[in-house]
Amino acid sequence: MRYEVQTYMSPQEVMEMAISFFGVGLDLELQSQGFGSLHFVGGGGHVTLTTRDEDPVSVELETREWDAQVEEFMARIARRRWWRRLWKGVKEELA
């Protein structure tokens, strides 16, 4: 299954969170890592994550056997953090 979500996190933050969520949290093996992409395998399936540096950042996920966990990850990164909104407002006022 393929999914796409937008986030206000940076691509680096998304990658770090994915490694923590899928690798450490779900014990999937990080099989490959490239510029803006990660590929995890385990439990008879896989998760592939690719980021595109846009505003907001676009994250594409492809999975087999890990759909519920991918949907949970998407919900976590899609939340807009209150401090990001605050910082954006401060930057606009200072400009």
Task: List where the protein language model places each region.
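Residue-level marker for the onset of beta-strands and adjacent loop->beta junctions
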Residues: 1, 34-36, 45-47
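Terminal, regulation- and interaction-focused segments at domain boundaries
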Residues: 1-30
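Short amphipathic alpha-helical segments, especially helix-boundary/capping motifs
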Residues: 12, 33, 47-51
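Alpha-helical structural elements
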Residues: 16-17, 35, 61
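Generic intrinsically disordered, low-complexity segments enriched for polar/acidic and small residues
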Residues: 18-19, 37, 70
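Residues that act as N-cap/strand-start positions at coil-to-secondary-structure junctions
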Residues: 24, 32-34, 43
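Short, hydrophobic/aromatic-rich segments at coil-to-beta transitions
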Residues: 32-39, 58
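Beta-strand/loop substructures that line and gate deep hydrophobic ligand-binding cavities in soluble
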Residues: 41-95
